From Swiss-Prot:
Keyword annotations: Phosphoprotein, Ribonucleoprotein, Ribosomal protein
Quaternary data: P1 and P2 exist as dimers at the large ribosomal subunit.
Family the entry assigns: Belongs to the eukaryotic ribosomal protein P1/P2 family.
Keyword check for Ribosomal protein: yes
A GO term from the CC aspect: cytosolic large ribosomal subunit
The protein, known as: Large ribosomal subunit protein P2-B
Modification(s) after translation: Phosphorylated.
Matching CDD domains: Ribosomal_P2
Gene3D superfamilies per UniProt: 1.10.10.1410
GO terms for biological process, alphabetical: cytoplasmic translational elongation
Native source species: Trypanosoma cruzi
Length: 112
């Protein structure tokens, strides 16, 4: 599924309770997005009969399932590196990253 069509569908649903493919296509074209009719048809068939709130809830449930299943794998991979003495390299990288983040302010100082 393409997120651009889902975003256009969500935007169109603010105006109509059940927007159609033509509504989604009109929004995409207004934004300068090229519409692939096959992909749009697939998305519209996949979300038929569901509200935007239902789609968001289903997506959030799927994302939390992915995050939970991926977290232990990342933790297991980091443990051998720390045991092998690889902890010094991330500390140096963190210091450099913090230094780069300070430069991102670009002199605006809005919250200083």
């Amino acid at each position: 599924m393409s997120m651009k069509y889902l975003a256009a569908y969500a935007l169109a649903s603010l105006n109509k309770p059940t927007p159609g493919a033509a509504d989604v296509e009109a929004i995409c074209k207004a934004c300068g997005i090229e519409v692939e009719s096959d992909a749009l048809s697939f998305v519209m068939e996949s979300i038929a009969g569901r509200s935007v709130a239902t789609l968001v809830a289903e997506g959030a449930a799927k994302m939390s399932a992915v995050a939970v299943s991926a977290a232990p794998a990342a933790g297991d991979a980091a443990a051998p590196a720390a045991a092998a003495g690889g902890a010094a390299a991330p500390a140096a990288a963190d210091a450099k990253k913090e230094e780069e983040e300070e430069d991102d302010d670009m002199g605006f100082g809005l919250f200083d």
